[in-house]
Amino acid sequence: DVPIFVQWTDDSSILVHHSKSEWRIWSDPVSKEEDMAERIEEFGMEVFKNKDIKVLWCGDVSETIYPKLKNNKLLKVNDIYYSLSWPVLDMFKYDSLLPGGHFKDIRNAKSKFYREHKAEVVNFDKVEKKLLHAIVDEWKNVALKKQKEDVYDLKYHKAIDNDFKGFLTARVFVVDGNPVGFNAGYEVVNSPGRFAGIMGIQDYSINELSLILWLEDLDWIKNAGYEKLDMQGDEEGGLKFKMQFHPVIERKTDTFSIIKK
């Protein structure tokens, strides 16, 4: 289950991992946009030479790829499993004070939370790893009950085990003496001033914890001087929450499976 890069002679590549019976592609191939679907086709034809491989999953790939793959005569592309929209927030326009009537409910929830709880933010290395793993486990348990699609917790556990290697920041939210969530992210490669909020995980132990974690992350990113925030992909429910902060939808992605005809 260790992710690997598959590379072509022209330096195109894709990030994948596999089990005994399936492969999974994570996000778009690193290639020219017009070559992305072709790279997935080539990879699919190669892995299906192994008769033990029954399915190839394409996870969160650009919405332009699916229609192109549907034309392949040797591969059967199944219906889209789910689609995500990816909002980007202009941090210059974001005001941490959350002024105006639009943010009244958020301000009230924030004020109530900090009146009722003692909270602090600490670096990840100040908290035992087993406690961070426990946050992820509880997040997964709740998430599986709330949504139909699969919940992938591997990347969170791996990040913890590897001391958040590659992340610019990883901060743990401690409430009333207990670690209850964490935020982590890094700068977007080749995009100066742009930050990716990759991880925001909580254990659902306190009312409004998700909101408060979001506000902590937004404040940190704002204070660090970043111009843009990639808020990460979401479906309708999570997207509705993010749109309160007036981001722009920059792209859409699909997740679907491919089998050999």
Language-model segments: which ranges?
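Glycine/small-residue-rich hydrophobic helix-like segments
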Residues: 161-227
